[in-house]
């Protein structure tokens, strides 16, 4: 790996390890642009982790000939599809920042319970070895989104919770074909939901702070 690229990833890792800033004497400890920047970095990291975990699980447990048919079954249905949230960048651009933050928070909170079982399911893989930290990473992103909501809502009452149903727990019985399919579907939804969250945050950041990285 090139020295410049390695230094960049080390900087990103260092930023991800930093806690969210606290307010001191009524003044924000970090500008809004930095709050958005940190949230985007954390969402990107989680989305990449979810994508890597999904690919590794698929490679390890799902025969290549079965993957296409499984993708088109109810196994791949995600609870997040039942809420009126944008499904892509173009739709997200039609929503307000406050709406996108609410949707992001709902998506993150729907996974806080299920991901606590990831480390019990995936114990013998280098990719899955970080799964016991996914919960902490999600909680950290949740805190960042809530900080942004406090900054942007400015006393406006919050909308009611839309997503009433959360996801099932991951099944630890990997010898069962049904359990494998269930986990495969959950990982697919986890990847999709984190991709949505990352997209929402990037759309908000780009339209508030015009930058070259807006083309994504």
UniProtKB/Swiss-Prot annotation:
SUPFAM superfamilies hit by this protein: 4-helical cytokines
Residues where Phosphoserine is found: 131
Database matches in CDD domains: somatotropin_like (cd10285)
Entry's Gene Ontology molecular function annotations: growth factor activity; growth hormone receptor binding; hormone activity; metal ion binding
Disulfide-linked positions: 78-189, 206-214
InterPro entries cross-referenced by the UniProt entry: 4_helix_cytokine-like_core, Somatotropin, Somatotropin/Prolactin, Somatotropin_CS
Signal peptide: 1-26
Cited Gene3D superfamilies: 1.20.1250.10
Annotated Gene Ontology cellular component terms: extracellular space
GO biological-process terms attached to the record: animal organ development; growth hormone receptor signaling pathway; positive regulation of growth; positive regulation of receptor signaling pathway via JAK-STAT; response to nutrient levels
Keyword annotations of the record: Disulfide bond, Hormone, Metal-binding, Phosphoprotein, Secreted, Signal, Zinc
Residue ranges crossing the lipid bilayer per the database entry: none
Keyword set includes Phosphoprotein: yes
Metal-binding listed as a keyword: yes
Major localisation: secreted
Subcellular location: Secreted
Protein residues bound to Zn(2+): 45, 198
Similarity comment: Belongs to the somatotropin/prolactin family.
UniProt xrefs under PANTHER family: SOMATOTROPIN, SOMATOTROPIN,PROLACTIN
Function: Plays an important role in growth control. Its major role in stimulating body growth is to stimulate the liver and other tissues to secrete IGF1. It stimulates both the differentiation and proliferation of myoblasts. It also stimulates amino acid uptake and protein synthesis in muscle and other tissues.
Name this protein carries in UniProt: Somatotropin
Upper taxonomic lineage: Eukaryota, Metazoa, Chordata, Craniata, Vertebrata
